[in-house]
Amino acid sequence: MTDTEMNDRRLPVGIQSFEVIRKGGYLYVDKTDIIWRLANRGKKYNYLSRPRRFGKSILVDTLRAYFEGKKELFEGLKVMELEKEWTCYPVIRLDMSCGGATPEELNSYLDDAFYKYEQKYEVAVRPEASLAVRFQNIIETMFQKTGKQAVILIDEYDSPLQHSWKTPQHDACTAIYKSVFAVLKKEDEHERFVFITGITKFTQISLFSVLNNLSNISFDAPYATICGISKQEAADNFIPEIEAMGEENGWTPEETLKQLTAFYDGYHFCSDNMVDIFNPFSLINALEDRKLRNYWASSGATSLLPKFVDDMEMKMEYFDHCFIEGDTLETSDVVNGGAELFLYQSGYLTIKGYDDGVYILGFPNFEVRKALYRVVVPALTMKSNSEVVSAQSFLRKMMQDGNTAEAKKALKALIADVPYSNKKMASMDMEERYRLIMSTIFRALGFRVEVERMLATGRIDMIVEVPSFIYVLELKLSNNGGISAAESQIKEKSYTEPFKADKRKVIALAVELDETGKGLIDWKEVDESL
């Protein structure tokens, strides 16, 4: 492909308007056959949960264009083989991510949104009319003036509820929801199709308590790929971009796709159709920049974690292979469903397997794993984020360069006094505390870490892999022999032997730790040949 042809290919970075994508000549992964089936399956009320930045808004906007009968935008897409009538319906679209986190902000957004529809359809409004009455009048007037039932699209319905959760504002926001969205059931005869997207499920609001016939398609196999990009779709639509990214980084196209898969793929949304799904936001940005970066996390994806997950820094290993009842995952309220449910709905965990009514959950990919570990390091080390970032950046560089003397200084600074001072670890023995802290720090750097690897000769405390080196760490407390005992064990058990075939240099480290929890005392490179 020539440079000119490549420049003509436009990736839709940050664009959530279907019309802009189609008229602007941006690349579009065609989901319109799935969207058509959703719109015409005979279910009036539909709900879809997907993580943030996962393509829900462009899905909603595509539905709007379809129901508004904008046939010209769909030329060349799969829906053209399916839709024959292209009926134009009146459409209400509400983007609740604009609704703020207080009742005042929520009222203001709905007031403004309803005003625009009142102006468009010339709805008579009494000054004292409530938001619920105005919503009802809009739906009825649409029907009266067009002769067509209304289509109602509510995007990111839970955003104000998430952001107000655990604040004094939450109950007032919930009351507004109950009042306004109870209208959906009252106006059933005037509605053609209602589609609601969100991340987390708050069942105490009327969307779920009143709409008892609300169809949750979040776990339905036919809609598993309605958001996101499958590996096949990536190969079908983005080969030139994959090749260009590979050329810039010295990878073959196959290696590039493998890297993208490790970083951004791995989502599954049902037990029957375990197709790997890329996070579309991260994939598109990576192809645009031709870099592997943490796009999803840097967009604010981790900001709500402290509200919904307590003591997460102590539970990371558990979350990477945890179990949850099918009924809990599919139907429970996020408020009462536990940390696993929130982490799944928010995209931090995904379905890894299913057995006898129980889902197995784990981290979907490298980007999410690294992002979560970076979030918990300040809490675990009891240091400010700025302190952690500075020390971690230096530690990463030194570990990647094989400079163990300088790496030791950075690690000392990060874990000084932590095992002693962090009372959440009181039930753990001292060596276990050090293993948790050190493995979390290394994982937050994006290194591959394995704890307590079993060999025929013994058990390696920790293995840390970086691009050019493999570090084999044996940890010993000062009152248990310290560096001398750790060095002897590495040699006697031949701990570096399993890695001799690897092209990377293997560095064995005998690590001495203070038995009272004051931190790293010293470490020493071990030469097994001596």
List each model region and its residues:
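Structural motif
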Residues: 151, 469-473, 507
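Metal-dependent nuclease catalytic cores in nucleic-acid-processing enzymes
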Residues: 180-187, 341-349, 439-444, 489-509
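Feature representing long, continuous alpha-helical segments
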Residues: 432, 436-440, 470, 488
